[in-house]
């Protein structure tokens, strides 16, 4: 019994492909992020469905720092209920709704020094496509983290694909159906999606490289750090400093 080793091997191969083919795009994205954060701005992060996971991976958590601004709408990301109130059917319907992205964007006052990063494996839903389009219309550079194979295989709902509305495209390198493993006796339905693994890896790669670039210019904000690394007092100091810095930037970003 291989106990899931097939998926682990497929996941390793996927990460190697991302590393080997997307390093240039990751570097360009990191430069955009460093420029925005170093100037005192925000990199606004957006994703629907399971793409909220890489958004939350960026900030706030251990090893992260202010400058990344997560924007997550619970109506499109609350998946654990599955059926009934707040169920999956509603979430999938909402993320296809034209015009909603502009309503979300209207809550924020974007600065010229800001940037936007949108995560979506398919890159096809109306909300993510229109969110990226609206950000570009506001003059902001847009980074798309998406699967080119999935995007090309699917049906456009927002009049375009996310990758068509971005200045930098990072390919998750996942197959058209996302899942990585085909099991004997189950020819139609592959199992074990890979997009979350790849998206989180891309998120952390950008986070680390952006930190390096900011450190080189002495503009890296406080890094949230575990008690296990620096002790309780220092950990608390770093948490508070990071939250205060995030609050300072966020106060300028809310539309009034």
What are these regions (language model features)?
Residues 1-4, 23, 30, 196-203:
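Amphipathic, non-membrane alpha-helical segments in soluble helical-bundle scaffolds
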Residues 38, 45-207:
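Glycine-rich phosphate-binding loops that contact phosphosugars or nucleotide phosphates
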Residues 21-29, 43, 215-224:
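Flexible, glycine/charged-enriched surface loops at secondary-structure junctions
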Residues 230-256:
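Acidic, Ser/Thr-rich low-complexity intrinsically disordered segments
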Residues 21-38, 104:
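A short, well-structured juxtamembrane/interface segment
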Residues 1-21:
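Generic N-terminal amphipathic, Lys/Arg-enriched alpha-helix
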């Amino acid at each position: 019994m291989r106990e899931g080793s097939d998926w682990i091997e497929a996941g390793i191969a996927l990460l190697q492909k991302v590393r080997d083919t997307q390093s240039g795009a990751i570097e360009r994205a990191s430069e955009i992020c460093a420029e925005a954060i170093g100037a005192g701005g925000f990199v606004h992060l957006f994703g629907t469905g399971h793409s909220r996971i890489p958004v939350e991976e960026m900030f706030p958590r251990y090893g992260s720092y202010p400058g990344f601004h997560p924007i997550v709408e619970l109506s499109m990301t609350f998946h654990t209920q599955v059926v009934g109130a707040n169920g999956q059917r509603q979430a999938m319907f909402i993320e296809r709704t034209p015009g909603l992205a502009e309503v979300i964007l209207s809550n924020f006052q974007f600065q010229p020094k800001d940037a936007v990063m949108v995560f979506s494996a398919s890159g096809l839903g109306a909300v993510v496509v229109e969110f990226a389009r609206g950000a570009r219309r506001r003059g902001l550079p847009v980074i798309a983290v998406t699967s080119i194979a999935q995007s090309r295989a699917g049906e456009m709902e927002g009049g375009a694909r996310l990758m068509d509305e971005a200045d930098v495209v990072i390919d998750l390198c996942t197959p058209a159906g996302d899942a990585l493993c085909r099991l004997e006796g189950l020819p139609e339905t592959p199992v074990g999606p890979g997009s979350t693994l790849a998206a989180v890896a891309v998120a952390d790669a950008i986070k680390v490289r952006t930190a390096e670039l900011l450190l080189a210019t002495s503009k890296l904000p406080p890094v949230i750090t575990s008690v296990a690394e620096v002790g309780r007092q220092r950990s608390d100091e770093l948490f508070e400093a990071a939250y205060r810095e995030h609050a300072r930037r966020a106060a300028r970003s809310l539309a009034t």
